[in-house]
């Protein structure tokens, strides 16, 4: 059922070391404020912190009470306050207001600010402007890599996507470079590096500088990971905009997986309580169904339930000695498996109910038509009806973006019509969202004679490579065209199927979208790894209108074992989806690779749209 790893599959590195490092550094920072202290934690950091150091660990290091950072006066009576926050201006203003309030009240306390994952000069400037710089000590907790699973690392920076791809803010590039530097320090150098996208190139260049400055740290080390591939999210928006149909992706779309765990409500747990469940390889039931197409999952869970019942029924014919062994060795494991099985069956039933209500089949049919370029008028009518029925503003926006990207922009008549209908249906406050989507290249209007010539492509790429900021704005309209149809043809993203696609025995990565579409990002990775370079992909790179790079260090490659050369680290800048992860796991099984994923955050179509929206729900 699940994709069993090939017997010759390489072993994954042990990433638990990253957790220990992060925990030790945090404890060191907390101990710099000796004695009892209250800890104020920003909401964004609560889940990642829980995976690194739980409440009991914090208590051991004299953290008395925990508070959530909220825009209201602090109720703490402690003489020492510690703040664990993201490096944001609003957080610094909030901390400064608390310090100034204490000053006015004549109260003397000690204050420590721990900024994660990085300390920015602008943050200290705010403290200076507010007149509290001398009262507060500022430190950095360089916690930028959280292992969510054996093969998945997350930087837990969902804001990266909007900051970079909409605002052009490059501050997180240093964080990415530092994270890659940490990985190469711990797990040896990467002999082969590939990448595509402007952000990927900048991250790579900065990382190489860090490597050169501290070359002695990795000198002589045997590489544990043979290849690294950096990829910008805007190289492939289409995959991220599609509805997910693998089990883990559907759970994320339906319940929102946050920091590797999910809150299952009463409709799943069949009780009056919600339950927080960690979803990773340790959950034996989940690990067998996570990468499966949803249509296969119910059958598997039913069979699993029957097998479990048969194991319970074995008790009936046992004598006392056998019963004793059964209770001490097997019963606990069976009960745990039974609990997990009940949860996943409940989750499947809940997903089925929601999807039936939404007419999921019709939605998928429309998406497939958009991907294939068929019945565009019919698909446009479906989107109009979606807007008219006021289904979900996010869902309607997603479909409009998918139509725009697959069609290389909307014809002016359709763009104006859909935009007007949307604003009338959901409210004029969404107007700024349309501006954001246009700037990011997600929802654009075709101009007369709108085609991208080879010359324009080269000029745009040259500017993108050589300069940042304002110069690229002049070329943004060139750089944002998708050319999806041409790329799709070149890379055979829409498989030709003779007869019905067998989702039980998938033949290629397209199974993650019911056999209709191979994720563009995954196909690019596959093609480059097959060639060990970008050779022969010049036309694809031109159509993508991105800068690509490849670098091989033969001296390091010679030191690498054949096993490590089959380990590939894929870095998604701007987020990756569970569908892409499942597709690459499948590719790994087929080709004898093991993929490791590093992402700025796990994303899906709803998160992508919410990041662009100016209307916060």
Curated annotation (Swiss-Prot):
Free-text description of this protein's post-translational modifications in UniProt: Phosphorylated on tyrosine residues.
GO BP of this protein: collagen fibril organization; collagen metabolic process; endosome organization; intracellular protein transport; lysosome localization; megakaryocyte development; melanosome localization; membrane fusion
Residues bearing PTM N-acetylalanine: 2
Subcellular location: Late endosome membrane; Lysosome membrane; Early endosome; Cytoplasmic vesicle, Clathrin-coated vesicle
Pfam families for the chain: Sec1
GO CC list: clathrin-coated vesicle; early endosome membrane; Golgi apparatus; HOPS complex; late endosome membrane; lysosomal membrane; perinuclear region of cytoplasm; platelet alpha granule
Residue ranges of coiled coil: none
InterPro entries according to UniProt: Sec-1-like_dom1, Sec-1-like_dom3a, Sec1-like, Sec1-like_dom2, Sec1-like_sf, VPS33_dom3b
Keywords annotated in UniProt: Acetylation, Cytoplasmic vesicle, Endosome, Lysosome, Membrane, Phosphoprotein, Protein transport, Transport
Inactivation phenotype: Increased platelet account and deficiency in platelet alpha-granules associated with bleeding diathesis and decreases aggregate formation; reduction of mature ype-II multivesicular bodies (MVB II) in megakaryocytes.
Record GO terms (molecular function): protein-containing complex binding
Membrane topology of the entry: Peripheral membrane protein
Note: Vps33b-deficient inner medullary collecting duct cells display abnormal expression of membrane proteins such as Ceacam5, structural and functional tight junction defects and reduced E-cadherin expression.
Assembly description: Interacts with RAB11A and VIPAS39. Associates with adapter protein complex 3 (AP-3), clathrin:AP-3 and clathrin:HGS complexes.
Role of this protein: May play a role in vesicle-mediated protein trafficking to lysosomal compartments and in membrane docking/fusion reactions of late endosomes/lysosomes. Required for proper trafficking and targeting of the collagen-modifying enzyme lysyl hydroxylase 3 (LH3) to intracellular collagen. Mediates phagolysosomal fusion in macrophages. Proposed to be involved in endosomal maturation implicating in part VIPAS39. In epithelial cells, the VPS33B:VIPAS39 complex may play a role in the apical RAB11A-dependentrecycling pathway and in the maintenance of the apical-basolateral polarity.
Entry's family note: Belongs to the STXBP/unc-18/SEC1 family.
Protein name from the UniProt record: Vacuolar protein sorting-associated protein 33B
Species of provenance: Mus musculus
């Amino acid at each position: 059922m699940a994709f069993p790893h090939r017997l010759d599959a390489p072993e994954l590195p042990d990433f638990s070391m990253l957790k220990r490092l992060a925990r030790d550094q945090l404890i060191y920072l907390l101990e710099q404020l000796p004695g009892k202290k209250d800890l104020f934690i920003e909401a964004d950091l609560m889940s990642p912190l829980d995976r690194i150091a739980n409440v009991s660990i914090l208590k051991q290091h004299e953290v008395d009470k925990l508070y959530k950072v909220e825009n209201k006066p602090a109720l703490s009576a402690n003489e020492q306050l510690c703040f664990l926050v993201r490096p944001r201006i609003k957080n610094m203003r909030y901390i400064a207001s608390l310090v100034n309030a204490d000053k006015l009240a004549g109260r003397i306390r000690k204050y420590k600010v721990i900024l994660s994952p990085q300390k920015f000069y602008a943050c200290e400037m705010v403290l200076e402007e507010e007149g509290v710089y001398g009262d507060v000590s500022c430190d950095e907790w360089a916690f930028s890599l959280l292992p969510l699973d054996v093969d998945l690392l997350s930087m837990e920076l969902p804001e990266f996507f909007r900051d970079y791809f909409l605002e052009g803010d490059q501050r997180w590039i240093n964080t990415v470079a530092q994270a890659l530097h940490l990985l190469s320090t711990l797990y040896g150098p990467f002999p082969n590096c590939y990448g595509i996208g402007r952000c990927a190139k900048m991250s790579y260049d900065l990382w190489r500088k860090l490597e050169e400055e501290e070359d002695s740290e990795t000198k002589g080390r045997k590489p544990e990971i043979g290849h690294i591939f950096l990829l910008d999210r805007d190289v492939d928006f289409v995959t991220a905009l599609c509805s997910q149909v693998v089990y883990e992706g559907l759970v994320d779309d339906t319940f929102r997986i946050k920091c590797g765990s999910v809150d299952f409500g009463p409709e799943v747990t069949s009780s009056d309580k919600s339950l927080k469940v960690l979803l990773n390889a340790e959950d034996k039931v989940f690990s067998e169904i996570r990468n499966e197409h949803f249509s296969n999952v119910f059958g598997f869970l039913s069979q699993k339930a029957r097998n479990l019942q048969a194991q319970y029924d074995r008790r009936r014919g046992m004598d006392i000695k056998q019963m004793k062994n059964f209770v001490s060795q097997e019963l606990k494991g069976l009960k745990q498996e039974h609990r997990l099985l009940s949860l996943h069956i409940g989750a499947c039933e809940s997903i089925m109910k929601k999807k039936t209500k939404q007419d999921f089949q019709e939605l998928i049919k429309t998406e497939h038509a958009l991907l294939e370029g068929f019945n565009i008028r019919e698909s446009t009518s479906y989107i109009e009806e979606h807007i008219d029925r006021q289904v979900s503003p996010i869902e309607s926006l997603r479909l409009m973006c998918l139509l725009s990207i697959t069609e290389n922009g909307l014809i002016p008549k359709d763009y104006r019509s859909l935009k007007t209908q949307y604003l009338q249906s959901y409210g004029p406050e969404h107007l700024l969202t349309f501006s954001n989507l246009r700037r990011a290249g997600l929802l654009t209007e075709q101009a007369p004679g709108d085609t991208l010539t080879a010359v324009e492509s080269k000029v745009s790429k040259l500017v993108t490579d050589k300069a940042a900021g304002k110069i690229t704005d002049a070329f943004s309209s060139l750089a944002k065209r998708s050319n999806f149809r041409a790329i799709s043809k070149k890379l055979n993203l829409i498989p030709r199927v003779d007869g019905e696609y067998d989702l039980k025995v998938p033949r290629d990565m397209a199974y993650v979208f019911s056999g209709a579409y191979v994720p563009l990002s995954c196909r690019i990775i596959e093609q480059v790894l097959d060639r060990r370079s970008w050779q022969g992909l010049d036309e694809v790179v031109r159509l993508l209108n991105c800068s690509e790079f490849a670098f091989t260090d033969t001296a390091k490659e010679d030191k690498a074992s054949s096993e490590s050369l089959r380990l590939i680290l894929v870095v998604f800048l701007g987020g990756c989806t569970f569908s892409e992860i499942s597709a690459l796991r499948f590719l790994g099984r087929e080709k004898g690779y093991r993929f490791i994923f590093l992402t700025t955050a796990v994303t899906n179509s709803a998160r992508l749209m919410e990041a662009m929206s100016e209307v916060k729900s």
